[in-house]
């Protein structure tokens, strides 16, 4: 599960000038090839803000899926940092494995009965072909040829093991001086030049551009991202990622299939959220509905469990058990709101289904517009059973003033046209909205009753029951 993002990390994000993405199980799901549609939006949005985008992968260029190539990253760090190009295919850095080291590795592999592969600039090859090798490599590089003497004619930038020895496999001392193993599959490890890593490749881009590590944000999921997570200013692990990588991550986001990259970048403020405002589109909202039946008429509301799940569950739970039956609206202020939900009728009582007060659930997509159903509270995170419905029909602010204050344009327009209580936004949890004209008429009727001390109606306005339509 993804964690919450703290303010300190959001502040660090203000320094980000470039974002690097791993490919497998980061941009796309390796086993299925699925890449979320949101990835295209991510690349376009970052570029539109002047933030550079890069790929940092263990794959070579010829192993990069077409849909990833079509994203046109500004820079590509390939083969775990051994080969770096920009989008114009200018070579920024390259570090082939010395020929004698390749020969020594092949001899050791043959002596150990280990199959291997070699990756050059333009193609990769295998020492042999069997089911174990195919199971490991075909999702990354399909239909590789068998060519064990490839290194005699081409530079080699990376190699692989294919074996069933797992993490216990170790290089002999003479090879470990030059090479290291990075496990990426149950039956395979990358064999890379010692000192070479994605972090090295990214650092070459950073130096080339005159940037600093603090300007770099990286996404990854596997062990070959460890050095990069140490290097970058901000590191984000995918929801499904290696536990050791998660320990180093500044933030663990959602899964690939849950638009984890988009989610993290929106939370960091590097991409503007594409907000939806269900209160302005009730016809297309499918949440549960309730009817508050009172001695002055009925009010029907739709609820928003996706935005305020705990609050909606509390309200529905109390309604279904009859908790609100017979309770009055104990506080009514015309051109403001009507408040109820306290069994003592004093504004001092009430209890949630959780047995204690619970936390606020603020959303960038819900506001205290006229007709909004919100939680009453005694301060932050003190929600119980009390609620109010916003009745105000006019506010002293124009649309442009609200926009300057940070309210989204559609919400600012709704406030200016229909009224509401914008000063309560992010102070009270909005979790529902009146749905029809009849309900608004009843709301206004209740708001117009005569009140006395502490805004309490002189004649009780009673909630007879709340009917729930899940």
Swiss-Prot record:
It catalyses: [protein]-peptidylproline (omega=180) = [protein]-peptidylproline (omega=0). Its EC number is 3.1.3.-, 5.2.1.8. GO terms for molecular function: metal ion binding; peptidyl-prolyl cis-trans isomerase activity; phosphatase activity. Pfam families: Hydrolase_3 (PF08282), Pro_isomerase (PF00160). It comes from the Bacteria. The active site is at 22 (nucleophile). It comes from Streptococcus pyogenes serotype M6 (strain ATCC BAA-946 / MGAS10394). Residues 286-468 form the PPIase cyclophilin-type domain. In the N-terminal section; belongs to the HAD-like hydrolase superfamily. Cof family. Coiled coil: none annotated. PPIases accelerate the folding of proteins. It catalyzes the cis-trans isomerization of proline imidic peptide bonds in oligopeptides. The lineage of its organism: Bacteria, Bacillati, Bacillota, Bacilli, Lactobacillales. This is Putative bifunctional phosphatase/peptidyl-prolyl cis-trans isomerase. InterPro entries: Cof, Cyclophilin-like_dom_sf, Cyclophilin-type_PPIase_dom, Cyclophilin_A-like, HAD-like_sf, HAD-SF_hydro_IIB, HAD_sf. Keywords: Hydrolase, Isomerase, Magnesium, Metal-binding, Rotamase. Its cofactor is Mg(2+). Mg(2+) binds at residues 22, 24, 221.
């Amino acid at each position: 599960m993804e964690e919450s993002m703290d303010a300190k990390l959001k502040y660090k994000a203000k320094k980000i000038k470039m974002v690097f993405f791993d490919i497998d199980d980061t941009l796309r799901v390796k086993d299925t090839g699925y890449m979320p549609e949101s990835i295209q939006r991510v690349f376009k949005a970052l570029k539109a803000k002047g933030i550079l985008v890069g790929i940092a992968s263990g794959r070579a260029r010829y192993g990069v899926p077409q849909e990833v190539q079509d994203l046109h990253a500004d820079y590509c760090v390939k083969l775990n940092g051994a080969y770096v190009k920009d989008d114009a295919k200018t070579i920024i850095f390259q570090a082939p494995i010395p020929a004698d080291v390749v020969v020594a590795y092949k001899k050791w592999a043959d002596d150990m009965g280990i199959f291997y592969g070699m990756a050059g600039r333009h193609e990769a090859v295998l020492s042999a072909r069997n089911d174990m090798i195919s199971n490991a490599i075909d999702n990354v590089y399909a239909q590789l040829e068998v060519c064990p003497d490839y290194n005699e004619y081409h530079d080699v930038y990376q190699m692989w093991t294919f074996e069933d020895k797992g993490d216990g496999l170790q290089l002999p001392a003479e090879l470990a001086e030059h090479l290291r193993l990075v496990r990426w599959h149950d039956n395979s490890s990358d064999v890379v030049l010692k000192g070479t890593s994605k972090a090295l490749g990214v650092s070459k881009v950073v130096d080339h551009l005159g940037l600093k590590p603090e300007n770099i944000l990286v996404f990854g999921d596997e062990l070959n991202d460890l050095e990069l997570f140490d290097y970058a200013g901000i590191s984000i692990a995918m929801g499904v990622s290696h536990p050791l990588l998660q320990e180093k991550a500044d933030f663990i986001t959602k899964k690939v299939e849950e638009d984890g990259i988009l989610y993290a970048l929106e939370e960091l403020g590097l991409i503007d959220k594409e907000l939806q405002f269900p209160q302005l589109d009730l016809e297309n909202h499918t949440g549960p509905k309730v009817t508050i039946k009172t001695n002055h008429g009925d009010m029907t509301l739709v609820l928003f469990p996706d935005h305020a799940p705990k609050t909606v569950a509390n309200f529905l739970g109390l309604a279904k058990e009859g908790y609100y039956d017979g309770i009055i609206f104990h506080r009514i202020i015309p051109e403001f709101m009507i408040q109820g939900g306290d069994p003592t009728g004093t504004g001092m009582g009430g209890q949630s289904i959780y047995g204690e007060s619970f936390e606020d659930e603020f959303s960038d997509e819900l506001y205290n517009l006229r007709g909004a159903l919100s939680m009453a509270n005694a301060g932050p995170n003190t929600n119980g059973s009390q609620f109010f419905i916003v009745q105000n029909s006019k506010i002293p602010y124009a649309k442009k003033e609200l926009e300057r204050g940070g309210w989204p344009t559609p919400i600012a327009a709704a406030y200016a046209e229909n009224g509401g209580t914008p000063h309560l936004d992010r102070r009270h949890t909005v979790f529902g909205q009146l749905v029809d004209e009849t309900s608004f008429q009843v709301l206004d009727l209740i708001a117009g009753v005569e009140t006395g001390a502490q805004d309490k109606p002189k004649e009780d306005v009673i909630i007879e029951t709340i009917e729930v339509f899940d």
